[in-house]
Amino acid sequence: MSTAIKAPTGKVYQTKQSPCEALKGALPCRFIFSGRSGCGKTNVAVNLLTRDRLFGKCFDRIYIFSPNAFADHAWEPVRAYIKHALKVDEKKDPCFFEAWDEAVMQQLIDEHGRIVRRQKRRGDTMLASAAFVIDDWIDDPKICHGANNPISGLAIKGRHKNCSLFLLSQKLYAIAPTIRVNSTGVLLWGCT
C-alpha cells in the first residue's frame, strides 16, 4: 500500500471569479472589514461588489443586512446594481434587511444551498454564487456569539454552498473568534 497522499477525484466545481489578478480564486470568501465609523468600510464593500474589475458580475444574489440598509445612501449603488445588473425585483425577492432576523438569513442561506445542490445534481460545473453583507450588526454579542448563529455558519461552512460573507464592524475583537479564524481576508482601518 502506497503512503503517498492523493488528491481526491471527481467533479470540479467553479464559481465566477474576479478578473483582478489579486482577487482571482478568492471566491467564495469570508472578508472582514474593521475600522472606526466613517473610515470607508462601506465604500470599499460597495466597490468590491459592484465594480466589474473587482467582484462585479461574480454574484447572482447580494443580500445586505444592516440597521441602516435604507437610511445609509452609501448602499444605493448596490441597490441599483441588484436591480439593473442582477435583474432582481426587490418587491418579490428582498435583498436589503434593516431588522435582524436570524430565521430570514438562515432561510436565504438554505435556499441558496438548495440551488447549488440542484446545479450539482444536474451536472453543472459553474455554480451560482451569493454574497451576504453584515454591516453594523456584529457588535451585538447576541448576534455574533450565539452557538448556532447563521453568521458563524457562513464563516465555517458557507463555501460549501458557494456563499461569500462580507462582515463590516467597528470592533475587530467584537467578532467571534470562530468567524475571525475562518476569514479569508481582513481589511483594517485604525481598529479598536
Predicted regions and their residues:
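N-terminal pre-Walker A segment at the start of P-loop NTPase domains
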Residues: 1-20, 69
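Conserved P-loop NTPase motor cores
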Residues: 17-19, 29-52, 67-69, 99-192
